[in-house]
Amino acid sequence: MEQHFLGCVKRAWDSAEVAPEPQPPPIVSSEDRGPWPLPLYPVLGEYSLDSCDLGLLSSPCWRLPGVYWQNGLSPGVQSTLEPSTAKPTEFSWPGTQKQQEAPVEEVGQAEEPDRLRLQQLPWSSPLHPWDRQQDTEVCDSGCLLERRHPPALQPWRHLPGFSDCLEWILRVGFAAFSVLWACCSRICGAKQP
């Protein structure tokens, strides 16, 4: 039986096609070296000509244009841009300038508390329970201590720029949630948490 099996294997082995020998990689000339232009993708650090994205897709978060810092959305973040002597303007999303220039008389008395609540949002308030606890200890004791960070982020704390980027992402997310919550409470009549 072993002879029969070995015979079948030998016939199958011998009837198999011979694979071509591996070819060495082609020699790359200096003309073939990259980087090749990719017209559909943004270039890192280059300002886009499209005025809607404000360079958000092509820049890391710590190099975003000064539109957010000039409008006071992130007062705790220091910008690398030179300070402007012009009076900061109220923040508005691109394309919404004309809607905000409506006369003040159109705003009803019922909408005024919501507008005040939106203007008084705590942009630098703690975003997590561990930050809230630390903030109350700071207020009660009167001494300034460094904020605690979640244990899951401790291995990443030594990377330069990671903490700043993460904090920026959390602040923007909190701001977006707060604005959406204020809109929902006005529409649905829900109470703010």
UniProtKB/Swiss-Prot annotation:
Keyword Nucleotide-binding part of the UniProt annotation: no
Molecular-function GO terms, alphabetical: signaling receptor activity
Region of interest (Disordered), ranges: 78-111
Keywords, alphabetical: Receptor
Tissues in which the protein is found: Widely expressed. Highly expressed in lymphocytes. Expressed in both resting CD4(+) and CD8(+) T-cells.
Annotated Polar residues bias: 78-87
Coiled-coil region: none
Pfam families: ANXA2R
This protein's record includes keyword Iron: no
Disulfide bonds: none
Biological function: May act as a receptor for annexin II on marrow stromal cells to induce osteoclast formation.
Protein name: Annexin-2 receptor
Gene, per the UniProt record: ANXA2R
